Each structure stands twice: as C-alpha cells, then as structure tokens.
Curated annotation (Swiss-Prot):
Its main location: mitochondrion. Residues 98-110 have a biased composition (Basic and acidic residues). It comes from the Eukaryota. Residues 1-29 form a transit peptide. It comes from Homo sapiens (Human). GO terms for cellular component: mitochondrion. This is Putative uncharacterized protein FLJ45275, mitochondrial. Residues 128-152 have a biased composition (Low complexity).
Amino acid sequence: MGWRFPSPSPRQASPVAPLLAAPTAVRSCSHCSGQREAISSHPLQLETPELGVCLPWHWEGWRQVRKITPSLPQPPGSQVPLEVTFHVRATLPHFRGGETKARRAREEGKLPSLGNAPAPRRRSVAWPAAEGSCAAPESSPPASEASLPAPESSLLVAGSGDLCADSF
C-alpha cells in the first residue's frame, strides 16, 4: 500500500497538498487578474522576480506557480488561499548553448580542446659565454669527464695565475 499525503478536503486527494503549506513569495500580476505566488521551498527552486508580472503566462523562467483567487474579501496582508490551481511547465537548463568564455578561449588557442591545460614548459637556463676574459680550453674534455664539476685549477686564466672574475 502506497503513502498518501493529507489532502485539504476529503474529496480531493492530491500529492501536491503539502506544497500548500510551503513558504511563498506573493506577487501581484500587472498583466492578469488575481495574485500568483511562487513556491520557494519546492525542489524545483524558483527565482522570485522583482517584476510585477505572472511569469509562466507572460515571460519565460518560472517552472511552477500557484494561483490564488480569493472569492471573499480578505484583509490586506492575508495569505489564506481559498482556491489554488497549480500550473506546471517543463523545465529547461539555464544555459542552452551559445558562446562561453571557455569555448572562446579554446577557439583562440588559449586552452586545449579537451582535458586540463598543459603544464608550463620548463626552460633550461643558458648562461652567456664568457667574452674573451677567460680563456677557453684548447681541447674539450672526454664525455665521461664533462659532467663532473671542474676543479679549481680550471678557473685560472692561462698564463696569469689569477682567478677569472667572470666565472663567479
């Protein structure tokens, strides 16, 4: 046996009855008669506009709205619904296509087409060659010795006996 929500009257068993007690934002409509209010605590969360219009009938954007048509005069500020009619329309996502910042950046080549952005390229630091103050060795060392640190004697300028100032 399934669950049934309590209904406002015994002849009307409706699953939307708990929504009648939901906190609402009442707006009077300038395009049609009566007042309509958006259900703000429903899972279909509604944006309450600052416009004084009944959006499902005159604009796009609201998904579910209930209409209040009082049959008896009520004091101002009263929110007792005497007759409630639900109007539901299909929902659409907020973004339905068009250009985004990411798509424009991909087209301009600033982002890759898929996946994460590439890692920044590492560049090896190339030191400028000494400009003649330090004498270059006449023969290059063998490949096995090229990766070893140079001894202090290689910092001497040929024939001067002093350390080369550009090598520091």
